[in-house]
Amino acid sequence: MVHSKVVIIGSGAGAHTAAIYLSRAELQPVLYEGMLANGTAAGGQLTTTTDVENFPGFPSGIGGAELMDNMRAQSERFGTEIITETISKLDLSSRPFKMWTEWNDDEGSEPVRTADAVIIATGANARRLNLPGEETYWQNGISACAVCDGAVPIFRNKPLYVIGGGDSAAEEAMFLAKYGSSVTVLVRKDKLRASNIMADRLLAHPKCKVRFNTVATEVIGENKPNGLMTHLRVKDVLSNAEEVVEANGLFYAVGHDPASGLVKGQVELDDEGYIITKPGTSFTNVEGVFACGDVQDKRYRQAITSAGSGCVAALEAEKFIAETETHQEAKPVL
C-alpha cells in the first residue's frame, strides 16, 4: 500500500488540468485514468468527438482524441504518475482516504493506495438511444452536444433533428437554427416538458418546428468508411406510420448520467447524481475531497469549463495539503 499526497480519479480535461497544476507544484499527483471506466475510454467524452473547434489555441480545430493525448502527455511531462486502472472503491470516512482498484476490491483486501486529498473528475456520459445506425454515424452526423458540434461544416445549411422535449432540447434546437437550414424537434409525447418560456420560444422560432408523438427508429447514411448520415426514419407513435426524412444531423438532448457511483453515500449528490460543490469552488461536503469537470457540472459540460474547474480543484487541493499536511515524498504506509 502506497501513500500519495493527492490522487486524481478521471481522465478528461478536468483531470489532466488538475494533474498539470499539481505536478508543477511538485505534489507528485497520481492519476487513475481507468480502463474503460464507466464504458468510456481514457480521455473521456472528448475521445468520441472528431473535431474540436471551440478550445482556445487551435485556430484550425483539433481532433478530440488528439487533444486528450496532448493533455495526457503534458501531465506526464511535469511528473504526473498515470495508472491505467479503474478505482472501484473509495473509503472517504477518514483521512488518509483509502482506495481499491477493480483488481483488488474483494472483501477484506488491503487498499492499493491512500491519499491526503482526492479529486473526483469522473465525468458524465451522454445518454444514447441505441438506434439502428447510431454506432455507424456517431460523430458522423449524430452528436449529443449541439454547442460542441453544431457549427461544424457538415451541419451548415442542412436539415437537422433534435430528440428530446425538455429545456435542453429547446435550447439546443434554437442554437442549431443558427447553422442548419431547418431544425425539427422530435417529442415522444403530445407536449413539451420544457418550461413555458422555453417552449414558447421554440414554437415561435421561424426555423424550428416540433413533431409531437414522434420517435426516431433508424439512422440512415452513406455506405462507406466515415460515411455521413443523410436520412432518418421516424414513426408516429399513435398511428405507427413510418417515413424516411432527409436529415444530415441528429442531436440527442435526452440527458447525461454523471459517473458518481464511486462516491454515492459518501459525498453529497443532487437528485440527478451530480456531485454538489460549494458554489465557485471545487469543495464537496467532505473535507479533502474535491470535484471538477462534468461530474459536478450539469449545465455547461464543455471541455474548457472542465479544464477551468480542474485548475480550481488543483489550486484548492494544493492549499488544503499545505495547510493540513507536511510536504514529504510519497512513501509506503507501514
UniProtKB/Swiss-Prot annotation:
User: Which domain of life does the protein's organism represent?
Assistant: Eukaryota
Offer an example of a GO molecular function term for this protein: thioredoxin-disulfide reductase (NADPH) activity
Q: Where on this chain does FAD bind?
A: S11, G12, A13, G14, T40, A41, Q45, N54, C148, D294, R301, Q302, A303
Spell out the reaction equation it catalyses.
[thioredoxin]-dithiol + NADP(+) = [thioredoxin]-disulfide + NADPH + H(+)
Query: What does the Swiss-Prot or TrEMBL cofactor note state?
Result: Binds 1 FAD per subunit.
For this protein, the record's InterPro entries field holds: FAD/NAD-bd_sf, FAD/NAD-binding_dom, Ferredoxin-NADP_redctase_2, Pyr_nucl-diS_OxRdtase_2_AS, Thioredox_Rdtase
Q: Name one GO cellular component term.
A: cytoplasm
What cystine pairs are annotated?
C145-C148
Keywords of the record: Disulfide bond, FAD, Flavoprotein, NADP, Oxidoreductase, Redox-active center
What EC number(s) are associated with this protein in UniProt?
A: 1.8.1.9
Q: Which cofactors are named for this entry?
A: FAD
Gene Ontology BP term (one): removal of superoxide radicals
What does the annotation say about its assembly with partners?
A: Homodimer.
Functional description taken from the UniProt entry: Component of the thioredoxin-thioredoxin reductase system which may be involved in biosynthesis of penicillins and cephalosporins and may be important in determining the thiol-disulfide redox balance.
The remark listed among the other comments is:
The active site is a redox-active disulfide bond.
Q: Which family does it belong to?
A: Belongs to the class-II pyridine nucleotide-disulfide oxidoreductase family.
Full protein name: Thioredoxin reductase
Gene source species: Penicillium chrysogenum (Penicillium notatum)
Q: Which gene encodes it?
A: TRR1
